[in-house]
């Protein structure tokens, strides 16, 4: 679950329930601005104290350094938490996997840029080194911008009408008429642009992968239950709004 939801008090009851029923991981942001580092560190500390946190999904190496400081300040043992290297690490080869193991990671997420052949080779040759996970459903983030597209600024101003807090959905439309959803983060004034199509992959093709991951943004509970059923059955969604990513492309 993204860190920003641990900051917002209105989600506290939901997070409390989830932490009791499931293994709860804090998903750290790709961009952490220097002037927000202390604030986010404090938010992580509060989340660890308030909920049963199983581990963290890290977006880059700087996240690891940040967590080292946070856990030290809380007098907590790093080995009591699981660390997952997110797809943003762009792990392409066995050397990178071994390096992650040395850094203390417990699992790595396969890069969406890899094709099927490379994924199979990477997972099968590292089963004894580091566990792997594959995103089999979800819209892939294409870009993280250090800027708010809705407010047209790199920070929040008092006169901003805060479109980011509304329930509306916002998109960028390209010359082909495809809509790319944008989701702002009003904590740091960062915007994420998502792919116009949703990735959907057959899990049965990747028997050496340890974990299959589902990324949801604003899907309903019924949609999520349907997604879980499809993934568990080893199938994928079909239709023009879905894609199998780069599975059939050359790397």
What is the predicted role of each segment?
Residues 1-251:
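Active-site pocket-lining/capping segments in soluble small-molecule metabolic enzymes
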